[in-house]
Amino acid sequence: MGLLATIFGRRQAAAPPRRGVSRRLILRAGFDAAKTTDENRRHWAEADHLSADAAATPDVRRVLRARARYEAANNSYAKGIVATLANDCVGTGPRLQVLTDDADANAAIEAEFAAWAKAVDLPGKLRTMRMAKAVDGEAFALLTTNPEIASAVLLDLRLVEADQVTTPSLRLPSLASESAVDGIEFDDFGNPTFYHVLRAHPGSLFGLPTAEFDRVPASGMVHVFRVDRPGQSRGVPEITPALTLFAQLRRYTLAVLGAAETAADFAGILYTDAPAAGEADSIEPMDTVELESRALVTMPAGWKMGQVDAKQPSTTYGEFKREILNEIARCLNMPFNVAAGNSASYNYASGRLDHQTYFKAIRVERSEFECRVLDRILNEWLREASRALDLVPAALRDAMTVPHAWFWDGHEHVDPAKEATAQSTRLASHTTTLAAEYARMGLDWEDQIRQRAKE
């Protein structure tokens, strides 16, 4: 063994790592953002570990709603951004296309649904819901029966503000429940079962707010909001990250305007280069003299007239507004020129590129409305219509819904000639279909082909 060990060498047991070295290696493999230093301590002071619902308590959401509504009501940019978002998302409203094998039944259902949507002003209510989603954080619509509707189907949507969907008893620990989150009851699988709707708005002008509420089944309530975190039950305003920026924009504009007005208020100032008790005539300090237009003015001996150098608005004022508006619009996936209503600094290519991201966000938003709002409305409408009008084919009456698709307004191209050429190329190369091309414009290809045949 001694000879073999000498020839081949003897394996030596590896020495255990020193604790100090191992610890240094762990520290080197850490994350800089996880370290707390004297420099970043104040920046991360408000970071917490709260759940989505614990962070968005009723009081927090109430404050955010009030401030978001205040900015939307008093800030022209905020109002325009929210209104533009609703107009671009909903437009003139969605149009239904039924896809069963019965062409006559399809046409009848589509016509009746379009007439009902016009009778209840469905596009207008959807636009209001989209604005409420941006400003209030969520939108609610009760599926009710309205006997005054000029339609055989009496289904209607009654919009309810987020303030009115709450449970006053949740503020009492003895009545709180883990399966309930302010205004909503959930089952064991996380599905909403009931909504608590106050009988009077908390901010109503007609009497004092009441704590009485109705338990509305989830089947009769449409609730839409942007889910940013797992386990989130209620929505917060989509413009929340921009609220402080809106305030800064208005404060800066008022400060610039105030400085310019202050400088313009003084037509001129008398000053002298003579020393104190010098040869200049003595005049009353802080005295004011009204000047006449197009008149010659004589100065006291030794005195000169000068004007205040108006430095406001500064050359950086416009740049500041552009940067802050760009940051404001980013939380809504909206490009600067859409938020500002000004494309002066854009060229053709940059405008197209910015709008690609925006239009993709609009498609996602429309898909969410189809899934969470329109499909539920359609299913309820079909149930009512099958009883009132007998429109649904017998083979589909027991189904949960009918095959269908939704069409929305298309987006106008900046250069229609180029778009028409590209469309012809796609059709000639068989990389698209008439259905897809008409869908881009928000049109039903079958209706358009029939119309072309008539012409």
Predicted features along the sequence, with ranges:
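Structured, mid-chain assembly/scaffold modules that mediate subunit interfaces
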Residues: 69-227, 426
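Surface-exposed loop-to-helix/strand elements on domain peripheries
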Residues: 99-110, 297-415
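Generic structural marker for isolated residues within well-ordered, non-membrane alpha-helices
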Residues: 113, 325, 434
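Short coil/turn segments at secondary-structure boundaries
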Residues: 128-129, 144, 259-267, 339-343, ...
